[in-house]
């Protein structure tokens, strides 16, 4: 996002090739159509805000049910600015999130919209709630295919005990748990582990899953022994 005084407007788009300039875009063929169709209204909205010079970036996340736009705001919004954002949110069916500092500082303008972004795995009925800045596969249908493929390749049985390394939010862990006796998800981030546990609870899989925060780049034979003893053996590893 950049205000261009000579053009009397705000540009919203990607950087030009090998440049810090923002491309003057009114549509984008590689974005979902409903996002592409928002480029012009979004430009008009931001151009009307008092903090348009303090809004350098927008991130987005899209699912079939929701479209979240994360505004990188460098100063507090005025009441008038927030009213305009709320009206835009209502008119175009988007969910605005604010990011005042680093990626972990994001929060939704309306708290009730915090759980609207979800990854679905229809075969197992698992839903994984994620935030707009979380790492997920950009193609959610392909993500679902990948999870299903993993279920097939692992040849899971009701007695299987599985370890899922770099489990993140439990995108694979939770579907695996629907076909196994126990799945241990291991992830480097304590925050992601906490959220994976919450996801297991939401999907009624807390009794079939465990999550641990560990530095997987320092994994040793002693760690293998520890998880082996904890699970009473390991049948599958992902």
What residues fall within each predicted segment?
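Short strand-connecting beta-turns/loops that link adjacent beta-strands
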Residues: 5-8, 63-65, 124
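Extended interfacial segments that mediate partner engagement and assembly in macromolecular machines
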Residues: 1-51, 55
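Peripheral terminal and linker regions in Fe-S/redox and tRNA-modifying enzymes
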Residues: 1, 41, 45-48, 66, ...
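Secondary-structure transition/turn motif
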Residues: 14-18, 71-76
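Rossmann-like S-adenosyl-L-methionine
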Residues: 76-238
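Short small-residue beta-strand/loop micro-motif enriched in glycine and branched aliphatics
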Residues: 20-26, 67-70, 130
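Carbohydrate-binding surface patches
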Residues: 61, 66-74
């Amino acid at each position: 996002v950049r205000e261009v005084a000579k053009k009397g407007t705000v540009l919203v788009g990607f950087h030009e090739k090998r440049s810090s300039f923002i491309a003057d875009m009114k549509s984008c063929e590689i974005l979902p159509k409903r996002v592409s169709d928002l480029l012009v209204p979004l430009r008009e909205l931001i151009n009307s805000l008092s903090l348009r010079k303090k809004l350098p970036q927008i991130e987005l996340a899209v699912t079939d049910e929701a479209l979240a736009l994360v505004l990188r705001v460098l100063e507090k919004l005025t009441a008038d600015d927030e009213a305009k954002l709320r009206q835009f949110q209502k008119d175009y069916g988007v969910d605005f999130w604010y990011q005042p500092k680093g990626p972990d500082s994001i929060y939704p303008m309306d708290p009730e919209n915090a759980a609207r972004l979800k990854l679905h795995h229809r075969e197992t009925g698992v839903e994984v709630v994620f935030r707009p800045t979380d790492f997920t596969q950009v193609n959610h249908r392909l993500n679902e295919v990948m999870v299903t493929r993993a279920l097939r390749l692992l040849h899971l049985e009701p007695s299987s005990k599985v370890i899922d390394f770099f489990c993140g939010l439990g995108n694979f862990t939770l579907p695996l748990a629907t076909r196994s006796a126990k799945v241990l998800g291991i992830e480097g981030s304590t925050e992601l582990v906490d959220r994976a546990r919450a996801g297991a609870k939401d999907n009624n899989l807390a009794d079939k899953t465990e999550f641990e925060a560990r530095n997987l780049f320092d994994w040793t034979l002693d760690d293998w022994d520890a998880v082996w003893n904890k699970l009473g053996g390991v049948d599958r590893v992902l």
